[in-house]
Amino acid sequence: MSSIAIRLLLIFSCALSSLPAHAAQHVILVVGDSLSAAYGINQDEGWVALLQRRLEKEHPGYSVVNASISGDTTRGGLGRIDTALRTHAPAVVVVELGGNDGLRGLPLKEMRSNLSAIISKSLAFNARVLLVGMRIPPNYGPLYTREFATIFTELAKQFEIACVPFLLDGVALDPQLLQGDGIHPLAVAQPRLLENVWPHLAPLLR
């Protein structure tokens, strides 16, 4: 090998060794509905975008893929989770679905089954899973409302995964933090959503 080739090889090797350790990104896949899709606000104001910026500072080895769709249900999420897992090979999957199932009064047995399947598929892909809990207004009746809320904690216990008790904690009952529909948070509320998620997500970033 010529001396020039050897020098080039050494330079290339040094360049590779000087690359930051976080150059290879680990993906956090967010599979959610309008609450994660920044409905009614700018995309860069949503809690998922805020999460990306926080990761860049605190966990630069991770990046976010936001696969959230406004209006999506657990059935819709189940229908696209396989493709999302194959496409993005996530290290962590954040499942934020179920709110639209509840608001539409869909059968809770089906919702539980769909969420269970999404979690199972994600775990089978060797991803760590964070389940994001939701609640619905009491006008759906005490039985439906109570059973809806317990699905998230019960599934988290069953699969031994992390769970955010309620994404809209501190937001849902404050009209000043909600859009005109009384459901979707304003941009000013998005940092609170991230703070509700972060303590449960951070331990998964290893």
Predicted features, each with a name:
Residues M1-L9:
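Bacterial N-terminal signal peptides that target proteins for export
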Residues L8-L9, H22-I28, P60-G61, V188-P191, ...:
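Catalytic-site microenvironment of enzymes
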Residues S18-P20:
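N-terminal signal peptide c-region/cleavage motif recognized by signal peptidases
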Residues G40, V65-T73, G102-L106, G182:
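Acidic/histidine-rich helix-loop elements
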Residues L50, L78-R206:
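Alpha-helical cap/lid subdomain in secreted, periplasmic
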